[in-house]
Amino acid sequence: NKYNIYFAYEDMNVVMNILKQNNAEQKNQIFDLNCQIEVLIDKRNTTKFESSIPPVSTIRIEFVGEE
């Protein structure tokens, strides 16, 4: 499954740890004041991935589609 993750630059370490824990494959990325990473998550790990996103208002995920 493909997701976009939007986050503030100061949350970079949190997001990178989440991606590492979920064996996410990074595709496109933009690192600026506001950051975006497109990732692929194995379908078997989507629930774990979605629940691992902390309830921080500066981190948001968006399901893009299946791949």
What are these regions (language model features)?
Residues 1-2, 22-25:
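A broad, low-specificity signal for short, low-complexity segments enriched in glycine/proline
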